[in-house]
Amino acid sequence: MYRTTFIGVFLLLSSSRIYAQIGEIKAESPFSFSASYIGDVVSNFKGGIRRGTSYLGLANMKGDFNTNKWWKGGEVFINIGNTHGGEPTANLVGDFQGVSNIEAGDLTFLYELWYKQSFGNFSATLGLQDLNAAFAVNEDGGLFTNSSFGIHSSIADNIPSPIFPLTALGANIQWNISDSFEWQTAIFDGTPDDFESNPYNTNWKLSKDQGFLAVTEFQIKKSLLPGKTGSYKFGIYYHQHNDTIETVRKNGGFYLVADQQITKKLFLFSQIGLSPKSVNKNDVYCSLGFNYKGLISSRPDDQFGVAVAHAGIHNSVIGSETAIETAYQLQINRNIFIKPDIQYIINPAGTDTKLANALVGFVRFGVQF
């Protein structure tokens, strides 16, 4: 029932947006709406848990309201999500990092709901937020489907991180120091309730027992090569909460993210994450990849890329895991893409059983309204 309701609202908002675009609206509205859908057809050809094929999807509805007609610099944003279909990591591949970054099971949930106020070079955001929407963002790794190219596994798997699909309440302050330097810091609920006790992510609780997650990031928006773009980020995070026996647990780590344009069409990226070996299973993470835009001259908006992600797992008989991904995104038009994708998972490490290397094939498609 909930899925049917969601799809109905999804189509209604999509139709409303299309109708508004067709109509001749002269005055700029403070409201804007958008919707998107991503679908994955995933096949595990060999290795892993078992061979097989599954389908999974992610639908999003977004609404944005700016306050400029009343006061300057205010923005309210809402994002509702629905995930459905199979779980290839859990049921087919058995990997640690997650072959699909939209895998979450069958859920309908409030993903983001926040207010942002800008003051010159400063801005403050308060509400339900995704940490990875602002921190540890890998700009040139967005082509890839494996979850680690979005958020490091050393963050996602070591602490209760407010990331897709389960976000958390938080406050974020950003300072654009200059055109080349930016600093931001945030604090989040340290232990957001899971979907079993909070099925739609609308029942929020804040208490000292849940602790907090603090993160700060400094970004240098300068290129190492003349005439090219580049971005370099360094972040530190600290997590604290009280467990069931009333003892304080502390954890943390740091990360680096580098995006560098090499030529007009070639972009390189790398990620590094480190966290204390004494309290973390995945103490080291690193990645390296490239994204080439317009490989075929007649298709300038297409993207091709190859990337490698390594999750160093030190206290397991299974050992560390490495994912190698190759993707080609065909941009059909401004709103539609199709992306064939191949991943080779060396030593899938997401189960308690030693698994054979897995070869996984994708066809991902996306639609935006």
Task: For each feature predicted by the language model, list its residue ranges.
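Membrane-embedded beta-strand positions of outer-membrane beta-barrel proteins
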Residues: F33-A35, V76-I80, A124-L126, I173, ...
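Outer-membrane beta-barrel pore domains and translocons
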Residues: S36-V42, G81-T83, Q129-L131, F188-G190, ...
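Outer membrane beta-barrel
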Residues: G52, L56-P192, N280-S298, Q303-N315
